[in-house]
Amino acid sequence: MASATNLADNIVVVECSNGWEARAEADGRLLVLINNHTVELSAGLGSAGEFYSVLTDVGVRVACSSGYAIVLAQISGLPHVGREPGNFSNITFTGNLANYYTAYGIVDSGYRGVVKAVQFANGVNTVVPPGCMSLGLVLVKLSTETINVTNINLTENGRSPRVNIFYDYFAPKRDEDAGYDISAQTNATIEPDESYFVELPIVFSSSNPAVTPCIFGRSSMNRRGLIVLPTRWVTGRTCCFFILNINKYPVYITKGQRVAQLVLTEDIDEALIPTNVNYNTPFPTYSPTGAVKHNPTPILWKFTEAFDHDAPSSARSEGGFGSTGL
């Protein structure tokens, strides 16, 4: 039975399997996961195109405070692992010795299942030797405030904007969710290798300058080969992002389909989400050496063999999203 004890903001409960090594780095800003076993990224039956997606069990369960979320990312800049991927290309893999990519994943505070990464590889099978896959879990503080959203057309025409229309474009979320779902506004066909531009006619304002709205993909979309380029919603600009179809066939999106999620963060690390709109990097990596935000309170990654007891109770438990999307 799970404990009902609330976690302190700076404590993350961690259970790690023998197949992975987990250790805190960069002054505790992230938990680095390195494979102790050979990871086989095998193409599943029915996979098509040059790239195929694989759901990789990263061997950990984590539990953080409800005011936080965890971002799963591929790590670069560590001396003991291969070089990080360059910008995505269907032809070359500049700088990517391992020939695999990892999509950003959001682990909600309520998720208690094993964290899984959506990864992409080329060829028939890609084998990653022990010690050559480096992933990271980055703790991200969520904003306690919402943002005020107005229609850009009303603002530009000098008319008084309506009251906050946030929920006209973003679905309500549960307390244990990190993000607000974003639905497609129209039907669309995304051609192979096409980056489809999504723009919502809205701008935001906030009384708290630390609030940083960011847009992330959804694991279910990643598994389909539709990658939302993770980006921040830049102040003064419309809400916009790109969806890349890495398949060798067109993919159809229907109006109302959930395609992305908005996460309201506070002072998110620019090494994780740069300050500008992301136009060309569907699979960014996180470099702890490039981090510019420093947590005033050190993060304690509390390792345990009694996870179900030490982790606070959760309405979601092992179901739903948690970098699985299934």
Curated annotation (Swiss-Prot):
Entry EC no(s): 3.6.1.23
BP-aspect Gene Ontology terms: dUTP metabolic process
KW Membrane (keyword) present: no
Physiological role: Involved in nucleotide metabolism: produces dUMP, the immediate precursor of thymidine nucleotides and decreases the intracellular concentration of dUTP to avoid uracil incorporation into viral DNA.
Keyword Metal-binding: yes
GO molecular function terms attached to this record: dUTP diphosphatase activity; metal ion binding
Pfam families reported in the protein's UniProt record: dUTPase
Gene name of the record: DUT
Binding site for substrate: R218, S219, S220, F321, G322
Swiss-Prot/TrEMBL catalytic activity: dUTP + H2O = dUMP + diphosphate + H(+)
Domain of life: Viruses
Family matches, as HAMAP family: HSV_DUT
Keywords: Hydrolase, Magnesium, Metal-binding, Nucleotide metabolism
Cofactor(s) needed: Mg(2+)
UniProt similarity note: Belongs to the dUTPase family.
UniProt-recorded name of the protein: Deoxyuridine 5'-triphosphate nucleotidohydrolase
